[in-house]
Amino acid sequence: MDVTRNTAVIVVPNRLDFAEALEHLQRVVYNGSKEDHHPDALHAEHFRSQVTIFPEGQFVAIDPHTGLIVGHTSSMLLHYTPGQPFTQPWVVTTDYGRLTPHDPLGDWMYGVESAVLPDYQGRGVGSALYAARFALAQQLNLRGMIAGSTIMNYHQYVDRMTPDEYVSAVVTGLVYDNNLTKQLRKGFRVLNVIPDYVSDELSCGYGAAILWDNPAYDPSQPSPLPSAA
């Protein structure tokens, strides 16, 4: 059953047999910048681990006309204390994308990864995948979603701005960032800058911790996730 639709894609739960296609998608999206030895690279084994550990949090976007997987998003659950900085590198939080730190009793969703094929970017695919994430957060009565946003355009400003200055400029709209700006428009807010967040030249390794509050969160109600019962 499809979770959500837009004019371009159908978003459905990820499956074990999609793993090889998703590994290929990652290689295309990152255009060789994440080779096999790269610490942030996701392989078929990682996607199988994600589906096995937390199937509810994994989604793919499929072109209904061709059957091609054109995007995906991965998430896990964890505990987070609001108001505290979030500074963990991506590889630590996610165990290199395997999701073994996933906590079924976690009250926050953590955004592990989201990627869309270049030919499908700008067509609402990313928004459809985020909509699936937000819907799941509301279904599970989570407090919200936290993630690290790789600041993809920082390399263009590294000689002029510190990471904190750059993120502040993105937040105020003075600078456009290919990643963070889009997430701010989806309702996220910035918590802090994360040094050594990822191994990435474009961001110089920096990320911004971002948070989305679930407007439907009801603290008097438990999460309905079966594994959290």
Residue ranges, per PLM feature:
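Aromatic/hydrophobic pocket-lining residues that form π-stacking "cages" and hydrophobic walls in ligand
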Residues: L22, R133, N179
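Short, cationic low-complexity segments
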Residues: P224-A229
